Amino acid sequence: MTQTLSQLENSGAFIERHIGPDAAQQQEMLNAVGAQSLNALTGQIVPKDIQLATPPQVGAPATEYAALAELKAIASRNKRFTSYIGMGYTAVQLPPVILRNMLENPGWYTAYTPYQPEVSQGRLEALLNFQQVTLDLTGLDMASASLLDEATAAAEAMAMAKRVSKLKNSNRFFVASDVHPQTLDVVRTRAETFGFEVIVDDAQKVLDHQDVFGVLLQQVGTTGEIHDYTALISELKSRKIVVSVAADIMALVLLTAPGKQGADIVFGSAQRFGVPMGYGGPHAAFFAAKDEYKRSMPGRIIGVSKDAAGNTALRMAMQTREQHIRREKANSNICTSQVLLANIASLYAVYHGPVGLKRIANRIHRLTDILAAGLQQKGLKLRHAHYFDTLCVEVADKAGVLARAEAAEINLRSDILNAVGITLDETTTRENVMQLFSVLLGDNHGLEIDTLDKDVAHDSRSIQPAMLRDDEILTHPVFNRYHSETEMMRYMHSLERKDLALNQAMIPLGSCTMKLNSAAEMIPITWPEFAELHPFCPPEQAEGYQQMIAQLADWLVKLTGYDAVCMQPNSGAQGEYAGLLAIRHYHESRNEGHRDICLIPASAHGTNPASAHMAGMQVVVVACDKNGNIDLTDLRAKAEQAGDNLSCIMVTYPSTHGVYEETIREVCEVVHQFGGQVYLDGANMNAQVGITSPGFIGADVSHLNLHKTFCIPHGGGGPGMGPIGVKAHLAPFVPGHSVVQIEGMLTRQGAVSAAPFGSASILPISWMYIRMMGAEGLKKASQVAILNANYIASRLQDAFPVLYTGRDGRVAHECILDIRPLKEETSISELDIAKRLIDYGFHAPTMSFPVAGTLMVEPTESESKVELDRFIDAMLAIRAEIDQVKAGVWPLEDNPLVNAPHIQSELVAEWAHPYSREVAVFPAGVADKYWPTVKRLDDVYGDRNLFCSCVPISEYQ
C-alpha cells in the first residue's frame, strides 16, 4: 500500500464530484484543442499580466461530510427564540409536501428563467397561479410574477408612479409614517438617485402637502393598525395622485382588497405563504396594478398565449419592457426575481385553498383577539383598536417585560416608544399566548384561553366592518382541487415533468453559468437553525449567521482581490445598483458630485445601462472593434470628452463576447487617469476564480452573482444574490441598514434591500461550495470551464463559426456561434435551431445576445465530456438538417427546424410533413427522451391578446 493516510482521507473528493470530466476525459479534450495541460491552456488564453502568481488563500478542500459537520456546528450558535417582532416577517409552516417535492427537488430549483417557454410550462403555470393569487387578494387587474422583496417593491412602486403620473412637473413622493422602517429606508435610497423629495408624515396629513405625484400607504401599519383609506384614496385620485398601498398577504385573506378601494398599485411580501424567514430572505414580493399601467410595470409578467397548433400555452409577456432589450430605458433593472419562492407561495395557496387560507387567517386573528382581550382585562392599554395580527401594547416597565421575554426565549418588538409590539402568525398556539400573558402580566395572571375565546368569538370589533372582505377569493379550480397530499404531490410532479432542468440535461446558456448545485450545498438551507431566524433578532441570537457570513465574506475578499464585501444586494442587478451608488457617493464625498457619466461598452448586458440609469447616471456607449474588444481609441475619446464629469466605466471580464481582452488593464488605467472608477461586472467570474481577480486587474468594485459562480441555484428565475466587493476607498459607501447595525461596516448609506444581509438563508450554499472545493478546486473549476468551452468551440467551428476568439484562436468560458451566414443562405434562424434543440433534449443556448443572430454557449465545468459530446452531436445533426433544407430535400416552410419543437401527440396525429415522425420526435434516439408539452409559442398573439390570469382548467387537459 503506497498511499498515505492523507491521500486515503481524500479531503478533495468533492472536487471530482463537482467537476464533470474526469482526468481521462480532460486529457482527451486537451488533446482535441491542442493543449498539454490545464495550466498550459490557461497560460495560452489568459493575458500574462493578470495571471495570479499564487492562488487565493481560502484553505484546503473538505469532504461533503466534514463541511456539513463544520457548518452544522456554526449554525448551532444561532439561538431559535420565538419571534413576535413582525415588521413584515413571520414564522411559517411550510407544508412538507411542498418542502420535499419543490424546495428540495432539483427539477424545480435547477431550472432557468423561462425565456424558452416550450420547456418551462410547469413553472409558468405555477407563476400564473401566483399572479392569480395576487389579483384576487389585491383586487387589481394586472400582476407580475414576483419582485425581490417588499421594500424594493415599494421603490419600484414609487418609480412606476412617476412614470404613469400626469403631474409631470412634480418630484415629491409622500410616504405614510407607519410603513415598515426598512421600506422607507429603501424608498429613500432610490428617491435620492431619481431626484425625488420624500415626504414622511401621518397619512391623514397627506393633503397638507402640495405638488405630490404619488403616495405610499400601508393598509396594516407597521405597529399593527388597520387603516380604512377608502375616502382618502378617493380624494387623492381626484387630485390625479398615484396611490400605492403596501399590504400583508395573509391579512388580505380577510381584509378588503386595496384595489377595490381605488388603489393604483398594491404590493407586499409573499413570505408568510409558506416561505421561512431565513434571517431576511429570500422571499418573493407580489406586485399588482391597474390594467392601464401594465406597460409601465416592473418585473416579469406571465401571459396566456397559443402555440403553433393553436393550443393554450404560457409565456413571459411584454418582454420588450425588460432591461435586456430596453437597456437604460427599461422600467427597472430587475433581472433575477424570486421564482422559486413565488412558486412556493403559489403552491401554498393551491394546497390550502380559499377555505384553508381563511381558516389560517381567522385562527391568527382569533388568537390575537384573545391576547388583546386578556391584556386589556388586566389593565394594559392597546395603542390601536383595529388590528389583524399585531398588537402595540403600552407597558410601564418595558425593561422588565423585555427581560422576562428574553428569559422565556421570546423576541418582542422593542423599538416603539413606551410600548412593545407583538405579531402572531400561523405557528402561534394557545400555549404561546399563555406564555405571552406570563411575560406581560406575570405568572399569576389567572387568564384562560377558552373563556377569553367565548368572549371574543361573539364580540370581536378589531376589524372595522367596512374593512372586512365581502367577495370570494381563489375561485379558480386549481385552488379548490389539490388538498389531499396525494393529489398535491401528483399536481406538482405534473408541473415538474413539463420543464427541462439540470436534472435532465445540460443548460448551455451563455452568461448564465448553469453549473451543479450539489445536494450537500443545498441541505443546510432547510436547517431550522438557518431557516427560522428573524432578520431583526438581537445579534447575539445570530452568532452562527454572523460567523458564516464573515467567513464567506473573507473568502470572497481573497478570491476577488478587493478589501471588503457587502452582502446586502439580493440579486445581480441590485449588486450593480449598490456598486454604482458606492461610486456616486464616493465622488460626492470628494465634492465631485457632478461626475455622472457612465461609460458602457456596446457589448454589455442590458442590466448595466438600466442600473446606471437607476443610479442617476448618464450612459455613454463605447464602441467595440471588429474582434469584439473595447475600442481603446474610442474609450480614450469618450473619457476625455467626459472629462471631470466621468464617473465610471462598467465592463465585464472576460468580455460578454467570450474572450479575455488583452487590454483590460489599460482600460482601467484610462478611466482612472480621468478620475473615474472601474465597475467590473461579476457575471463572468467563473472564468476568473483562482486564475485572476477583479482587484488584481485594477477594478474598484464588482458584484458577484452567487447564483452563477458560487452555486446558488437559479430556481427557475430566482433567487439570486449579488454581494459587492469593493476597494478600501469605496467601503464607507456600501449600503447600510436603518434597523440593524451591520457589524464591521462603517457605512452611513441607505439600504438597497429589505434585510441587512439580503437573502441570507441561501448564503450557506456558497459557503459550502468554497469550503468543499478549497483553493485548489476553485481554480480547477475555472480551468475546466475554459476547457469545456474551447472543446465545444473547436468541434463546432467548422459547422457554426465562432464569432469572437482571443489569442491563439481561443475563447474564455463561453463561445458565440455565428448563425448569420446560414440564416442568409437558408433563412433558418437561431430561433429555429434553439427550438430544434428541444427535440434533441436540450435547453437552447442564449439567443441573439450579445449579438443578434447568434447563439452563446457556456457549458460550465460541471458537464462531463459525455454530455458535451451529446450536445455537440445534436448541433452537428442540426447542421446536417440545415444542409438538407439548403439542398432542397426539405422545403423551407416545412422541415424539422421550422416546425420544432415536436410534441408527443404528433406521433399519432395525421402526418403530412416531408420528413418522418421518427426524424421529428426521436432525432437523438428513444432513450431518455424529453417531451415538450407545447409547440412553438406565438409571441405576437400573446402580446396582442394579453391575458395574465388563470384560464379554465380544461385548457390544460
From Swiss-Prot:
GO terms for cellular component: cytosol; glycine cleavage complex. Its cofactor is pyridoxal 5'-phosphate. Pfam families: GcvP2_C (PF21478), GDC-P (PF02347). SUPFAM superfamilies: PLP-dependent transferases. It is an enzyme of class 1 (oxidoreductase). Its EC number is 1.4.4.2. Signal peptide: none annotated. The modification N6-(pyridoxal phosphate)lysine is found at residue 708. It catalyses: N(6)-[(R)-lipoyl]-L-lysyl-[glycine-cleavage complex H protein] + glycine + H(+) = N(6)-[(R)-S(8)-aminomethyldihydrolipoyl]-L-lysyl-[glycine-cleavage complex H protein] + CO2. It comes from the Bacteria. The glycine cleavage system catalyzes the degradation of glycine. The P protein binds the alpha-amino group of glycine through its pyridoxal phosphate cofactor; CO(2) is released and the remaining methylamine moiety is then transferred to the lipoamide cofactor of the H protein. Belongs to the GcvP family. This is Glycine dehydrogenase (decarboxylating). It comes from Shigella boydii serotype 18 (strain CDC 3083-94 / BS512). The gene is gcvP.
